[in-house]
From Swiss-Prot:
Active site positions: K250
Organism taxonomic ancestry: Bacteria, Pseudomonadati, Aquificota, Aquificia, Aquificales
Name listed for the protein in its UniProt record: Probable DNA ligase
BP-aspect Gene Ontology terms: cell division; DNA biosynthetic process; DNA recombination; DNA repair; lagging strand elongation
Family the entry assigns: Belongs to the ATP-dependent DNA ligase family.
Amino acid sequence: MEYRILAEFYERIEKTTSRIEMVSSLVELFKQTPKELIDKVVYLSIGKIAPEYTGLDYNFGEKLAIRALSRVLKIPALEIEKRVRQEGDLGEAGRKLYEELGFKPEGTLTVEEVYNGLLNIAKAVGIGSQERKISIFASLLKKATPLEAKYLLRTITERLRLGIGDNTILEALSIAFTGSSVNREVVERAYNLTSDLGYVAKILAEKGLEGVKQVKIQVGRPVRPMLAERMSSPILILRKLGGKCGAEYKYDGERIQAHRKGDEFYLFSRRLENITHQYPDLIEFLKEAIPHDFIVELEAVVIDPASGEIRPFQELMHRKVKYVTKYHITKYPVAGFLFDIIYLDGEDLTLKPYPERREILEKVVKRTDRIGLVPRKIVDNVEDLENFFYQAIEEGCEGLVCKSLAPNSIYQAGKRGFLWIKYKRDYKSVLADTLDLVVVGGFYGKGQRKGTFGSLLMACYDPESDMFKTVTKVGTGFTEDDFKKLEEILMPRKLNHRHPRVNSILEADMWFEPYLVLEITGAELTLSPVHTCGWGKVSPNRGIGLRFPRFTGRYRFDKRPEDATTEQEIIEMYRMQRKIRVRS
């Protein structure tokens, strides 16, 4: 299969502002793809060569790409850098240079060649690896047409800019190989259990829907985490959960999914990144505490060994290094508090109800001074829930996670729903909690910010439509250093038009690929004629907007755009806020 076909589809997708057209283009592409290549085409279409958890990265920045391009086009790197500044995009600059110089490709690029070349670049390490990477990439550029060069350059620098989401891929795969998006739920469950789009695509293409139904949990492949909705009223929480729930402490730590098979251990972050190397001590604690093959979920926190008290979340950031040494382990000792088990000795536990999973967890875990279970209390009245909430706050927690005890309280991998409800409270604001919102656009600033953005258009995520819907426009809370950092992150992801997965009434001065999640606070949620979050769901011809928004200073690099606060959460927060006003 020629790489040209992919490049042409990417160009078509980049130009559309319609998600329906994006899905349609992907369906057409997947139908044209040979079955043996479908996994590679899926990976390349999201700018990857493997799932996130493998840790395979190109480690090939723009400067290396320019060196390779300079070598192929036989022009100075400085000239290329100048064009990149003019175009604002290395890929587009490369395409135009190819055309202007009348570059003649030395052959025809295939998808296999591109994939294998990129894989070899990702695997190149050690002495001389940089030169090997440049040489491999240059060999691909030599065979590229102008359009192919554009997408090769974007791919290698991890700035593909198509913004194709997981749900969009899953929908397109379902239509392409089963004839209907109705089957997406089956395909999605297989993905939620394996976190590998390419793997699921290949099974679907080769073995059909029945093959996908046989996909099982595997130790070493992270399960996409179940997520909680949020509420700030104990009355509503109990009502939502049938009058009774299991309330658990919500620690301000790092959520980790731990896997064990014999002597093999894997630790995965909330974003499904392999972080095994960051916690060698935690692995030893788990080895002692659970003598079984397992997949468990826990919160890792830094503790004071003398008092057992939990230290601030920021101290955990010192573990985010390439090589964790004895110094890190001693200076920032961690403990793990387990809250779920989804696999035990070959058995998938995700379809068992929460009370049964908790009972299994209590039976198999040997408590130590570094491994424990998240404290839990079964509550059926507001007073008990409130008292347990205050107890959690006093012990340094963020609040509670209230869990359904019903027979249908299964582990919903990759889903956010009301089987789990976060109960947090911010007494300084009418707004019950901060929002994690995605940057989708920018507006020109004034004074020192003239010519670049001075405020950002922020959106929530709607998993039903796989769309980002606007909530607010924020320009306060940012320092000059923040603006510099934001420019570095956002400008390489600037688009010529609104992204097809962004639903916005407002016309931004510049648009960005949905990528960066920021923590935003504000005064209150109000009805809005210009924001699309909850449009028509709480009032005709109105959405929900956030008044007096402010950046808290927290960049949520641990969250993907699809992990942002959902539209439904904001609707619930708005309704809750109105009830509080009525009562007061």
